[in-house]
Amino acid sequence: HKQSLTGQQIHKMLVDQGFDISYCTIINKIREKNKKAKECFIKQSYNYGERLEYDFGEVKLLINGSLGTYHMAVISSPAGDFRWAYLYRNQKKEAFLDSHVKFFEMVGGVYKEVTYDNMKNVVTKFIGKNQKELNEDFLKLSIYYGFNINVTNCFSGNEKGHVEGSVKIIRSYVFANKYEFPSLEHAQIYLHSQLLKLNENSKMDEEK
């Protein structure tokens, strides 16, 4: 069987080999390694119609001869493996709210929960370590449509991993080879047509 060395034994071995290192440093390193080893991400599974994930992603497009950075509001369903996006000139509140309205109108219904990171459009300010004050206009939107808001922990992208992966998939699938359009409207139409192809094998019909 594998032998386990104690902190004292490791410290003695290193000192004997000529390393100038304190016992406390050894202990701290062992604790740090053990903590990392315990961290694991469990893949979540959801029922149809239960959860959406939301994120913004940037894409560079040549519109009417001018190169610029545009913003994709990306909404995805982990259960249905469905991905959708809308192009905007910015990530302001108007674009954020508009993307929800467009998506719910398109699918003809509302999911029980939508998950977000701590973006400004969602979280107005932090109160203490765990409390968050949500944007008032966004709260009104969620009440109107009747969905629950789930905000991830800070720096925990894995909590909405499906949409983060969807941003990359849509960007590469749709705009890797074609990024020049006469207008943003034309880019939007092209995005829509490519998303229909991308979602051919999704389970969106089962979710409705």
What are the language-model segments listed below?
Residues 110-130:
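Acidic/histidine-rich, metal-coordinating catalytic segments
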Residues 116-117, 128-129, 149-171:
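RNase H-like two-metal-ion nuclease catalytic core shared by retroviral integrases
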Residues 12-24, 28-83, 91-98, 143:
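Mobile-element integrase/transposase regions
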Residues 167-208:
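Active-site-proximal acidic segments at structured loop/helix or strand boundaries
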Residues 137-139, 143-160, 179-181:
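RNase H-like polynucleotidyl transferase catalytic core
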Residues 85-110, 134:
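Active-site beta-loop-alpha junctions of metal-dependent nucleic acid enzymes
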Residues 2-14:
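Short, charged amphipathic recognition helices of the HTH superfamily
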